[in-house]
């Protein structure tokens, strides 16, 4: 049971009585009475109602004796049966002046504080608490000091100010303060009656120095004055607000009447509209209960309150979202294939996968949508393919660009508690589509970044997991939403920058760059008609020859896709549009000569194979983000001491390939026919031209090995031959990537034969046969097979002299 708060009592003691209290002797073992919310100070008289059985036994026993007890404040306010661990260690010796037993069984005592003490040791806990204590002495200040006088005067002034500001304090208190003669008792009296927290009052009691106690008391009183001033301001503002609210009420009533007259929507009409839309939604019981709860909350909120628009917008989102409202898929596979072929040339793998999905969906209507990732170089039609897929399926199309997204809230949304909160881009996109099964393009998923605000790619893990996205939780939405019917298609230029866990959730479909023949067909079927239409030209106004298209592709673009090709075609079409608009003569059939006249000098120099009667010149093949290229590797020797020099801005992997090739060559000197001494008497320099362009990767391994073998044997290299493959110290030839792009680059450069690893044969089978009809392939497993094909028996016309002079024999002494 709680001990009650002290009632207002204004006792006065004289300095003489205070001096007698300081001299009074008290027993070293005292019964301890724990009290709540009360700190008793020496000299102060307080009434206390005692309700605990332990406390009642203690009071009744010692009231019959010398009436001396120890009063200690309870530190743990929640404890109903406090122990020594639940009370403070400093308390006040008290004399029980009076005791009253009330009809309800409670006992009220009037006590007066005498001396401060500190609990040293626990003596007993039953039938009441007893402890061994030591008395604490007060350090009294020199009252003649100006600082002490000023401090006490400030305390009195603050007390007077509180009395004037707080109407609940009796006016007699001011008279009592004025009549207190003892400065020490004045601080005790004010400390007991100040409006402060229990821990602050206990701190006042524990001070030994009276000056420190008065200083801390003054700080608490100043804080109390500040609180009273704030209360007064609030009280004044409340009265003003009530008047304003009454005025607003009458104005709103007038506005309501005017709205009814004009036919405008009122809040009640908005509520009815939301409820009517809610009845049409296919919600689960949980979502419907959540809507009803938020709706009930909105109806209780003042329309002028800041929370009103947030809650209203939230409810609008709930009723505007499509919940299980799927568009009807068109299961005509022939039509779907025609649409995909009509909009995009090639891309066989992707088209086949979409047709498979549509076929399975036709057989099993509740199939979860796949998560596809179209991976390939820029400009090959990854993003635009999404539109064609949506068109083929008769679904809505939504696109979200992830490039530069660095805030997790862009995916999951913000919580409603934040100002300007809104749902994430996923939920926003679903709302715009008005269906639960759109085609959703996540563009540039490899370009997501992260910072201190979170990792968006981690947030996408839930979105792109077919096992989890049926219960996607948006922070703003606060209820689960089913994304399992959404056909997510991500696009990416690279895979290494995508988080591994995210990459694992997607079905990766690689889209390679277009061949020259494919680009010609794309230009004729798609790009040229599109540019004519965009620039207002008719079909008969202009036509391109195949040679003109090839000229644009080879001399003015260098890319795997067709973006720049479209720009250059657009430039030619615009030039013709100017001629038509100005009614000047022009050539309707565009030839290569007209292309150069309109576009100017060639932007790129075409890679062509150049045959040289030199040793060590080998044609390798390289892959770039813009397609394949031929890579010339040169090596030369000069007299020296076996120094190896590598140049051409080679990366670490390519340098290691050169070192491995040289080591393998030195290990096979006998089989190849090289004098092992040449490695110590000649310096070797390997160079890869286009020194400003960084080059790296292991695919030049066999080309480097062939170049070194030709240099140290001075034998010719087979003409019109190119090669690509990684080499090992055991002489094995390993497969490499980018085969399609490399093969097409070799064909454009005039290469006739190509050496590849035997394990790359499967890559050749995926290339359209007409594209490689004029090429001969050699599939090898070892470096010896490479040299057998690449090195001719005859030497070059002017071979370098590799003879090493015999060292003179040392004579025996």
Curated annotation (Swiss-Prot):
Record-stated family: Belongs to the peptidase S16 family.
First-listed, main subcellular location of the protein, grouped into a coarse class: cytoplasm
Keyword presence, Protease: yes
One of the GO biological process terms: protein quality control for misfolded or incompletely synthesized proteins
Ligand binding (ATP): 376-383
Gene Ontology MF terms: ATP binding; ATP hydrolysis activity; ATP-dependent peptidase activity; sequence-specific DNA binding; serine-type endopeptidase activity
Subunit structure: Homohexamer. Organized in a ring with a central cavity.
Pfam families documented for this protein: AAA, Lon_C, Lon_lid, LON_substr_bdg
Identification of the protein by name: Lon protease
Limits of the Lon N-terminal domain: 30-225
Organism in which the protein naturally occurs: Cytophaga hutchinsonii (strain ATCC 33406 / DSM 1761 / CIP 103989 / NBRC 15051 / NCIMB 9469 / D465)
Expression triggers: By heat shock.
């Amino acid at each position: 049971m709680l001990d009650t708060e002290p009632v207002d009592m204004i006792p006065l003691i004289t300095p003489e009585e205070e001096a007698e209290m300081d001299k009074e002797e008290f027993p070293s073992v005292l019964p301890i009475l724990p009290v709540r919310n009360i700190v008793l100070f020496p000299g102060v008289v307080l009434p206390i109602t005692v309700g605990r059985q332990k406390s009642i036994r203690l009071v009744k026993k010692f009231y019959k004796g010398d009436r001396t007890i120890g009063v200690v404040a309870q530190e743990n306010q929640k404890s109903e049966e406090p122990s020594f661990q639940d009370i403070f260690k400093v308390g006040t010796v008290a004399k029980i002046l009076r005791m009253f037993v009330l009809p309800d069984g409670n006992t009220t005592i009037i006590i007066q504080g005498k001396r401060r003490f500190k609990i040293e040791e626990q003596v007993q806990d039953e039938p009441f608490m007893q402890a061994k204590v030591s008395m604490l002495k007060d350090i009294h200040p020199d009252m003649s000091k100006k600082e002490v006088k000023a401090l006490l005067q400030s305390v009195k002034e603050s007390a007077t100010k509180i009395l004037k500001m707080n109407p609940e304090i009796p006016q007699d208190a001011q008279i009592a303060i004025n009549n207190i003669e003892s400065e020490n008792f004045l601080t005790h009296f004010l400390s007991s009656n100040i409006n402060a927290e229990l821990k602050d009052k206990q701190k006042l009691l524990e001070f030994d120095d009276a000056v420190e106690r008065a200083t801390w008391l003054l700080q608490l009183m100043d804080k109390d004055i500040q609180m009273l001033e704030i209360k007064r301001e609030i009280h004044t503002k409340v009265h003003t607000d009530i008047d304003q609210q009454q005025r607003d009420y009458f104005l709103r009533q007038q506005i309501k009447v005017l709205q009814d007259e004009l036919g405008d929507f009122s809040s009640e009409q908005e509520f009815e509209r939301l409820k009517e839309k809610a009845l049409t939604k296919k919600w689960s019981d949980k979502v419907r209960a959540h809507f009803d709860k938020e709706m009930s909350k909105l109806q209780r909120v003042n329309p002028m309150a800041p929370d009103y628009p947030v809650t209203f917008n939230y409810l609008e989102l709930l009723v505007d979202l499509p919940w299980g409202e799927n568009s009807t898929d068109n299961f005509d596979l022939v039509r779907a294939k025609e649409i995909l072929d009509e909009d995009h040339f090639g891309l066989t793998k992707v088209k086949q996968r979409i047709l498979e999905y549509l076929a399975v969906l036709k057989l099993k209507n509740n199939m979860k949508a796949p998560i596809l990732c179209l991976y390939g170089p820029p400009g090959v039609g990854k993003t635009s393919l999404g539109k064609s897929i949506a068109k083929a399926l008769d679904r809505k199309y939504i696109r979200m660009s992830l490039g530069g997204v660095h805030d997790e809230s862009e995916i999951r949304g913000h919580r409603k508690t934040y100002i300007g909160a809104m749902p994430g881009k996923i939920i926003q996109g679903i709302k715009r589509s008005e269906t639960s099964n759109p085609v959703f393009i996540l563009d540039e998923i490899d370009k997501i970044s992260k910072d201190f605000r979170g990792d968006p790619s981690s947030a996408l893990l839930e979105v792109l997991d077919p096992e989890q996205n049926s219960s996607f939780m948006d922070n703003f939405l606060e209820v689960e939403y089913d994304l399992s019917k959404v056909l997510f298609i991500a696009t990416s230029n690279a895979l290494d920058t995508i988080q591994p866990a995210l990459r694992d959730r997607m079905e990766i479909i690689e889209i390679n760059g277009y061949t020259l023949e494919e680009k010609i067909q794309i230009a004729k079927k798609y790009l040229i008609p599109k540019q004519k239409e965009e620039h207002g030209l008719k079909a008969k106004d202009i036509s391109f020859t195949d040679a003109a298209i090839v000229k644009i592709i080879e001399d003015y673009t260098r890319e795997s896709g067709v973006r720049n090709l479209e720009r250059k075609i657009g430039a030619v079409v615009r030039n013709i549009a100017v001629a038509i608009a100005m009614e000047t003569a022009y050539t309707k059939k565009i030839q290569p000569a007209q292309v150069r006249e309109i576009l100017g000098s060639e932007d790129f120099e075409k890679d062509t194979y150049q045959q040289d009667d030199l040793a060590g010149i080998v044609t390798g093949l390289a892959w770039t983000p813009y397609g394949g290229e031929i890579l010339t590797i040169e090596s030369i020797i000069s007299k020296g001491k076996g120094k190896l020099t590598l140049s051409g801005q080679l990366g670490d992997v390519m340098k290691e390939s050169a070192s491995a090739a040289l080591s393998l060559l030195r290990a096979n000197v006998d089989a190849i026919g090289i004098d092992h001494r040449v490695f110590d008497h000649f310096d070797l320099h390997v160079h890869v031209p286009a020194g400003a362009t960084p080059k790296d990767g292991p695919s030049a391994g066999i080309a480097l090995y062939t170049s070194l073998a030709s240099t140290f044997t001075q034998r010719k290299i087979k003409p019109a031959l190119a090669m690509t493959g990684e080499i090992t110290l055991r002489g094995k030839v390993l497969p490499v990537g980018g085969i399609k792009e490399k093969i097409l680059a070799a064909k454009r450069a005039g290469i006739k034969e190509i050496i590849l690893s035997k394990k790359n044969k499967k890559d050749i089978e995926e290339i359209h046969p007409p594209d490689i009809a004029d090429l001969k392939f050699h599939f090898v497993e070892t470096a010896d097979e490479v040299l057998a094909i690449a090195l001719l028996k005859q030497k070059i016309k002017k071979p370098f002299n590799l003879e090493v002079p015999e060292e003179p024999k040392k004579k025996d002494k």
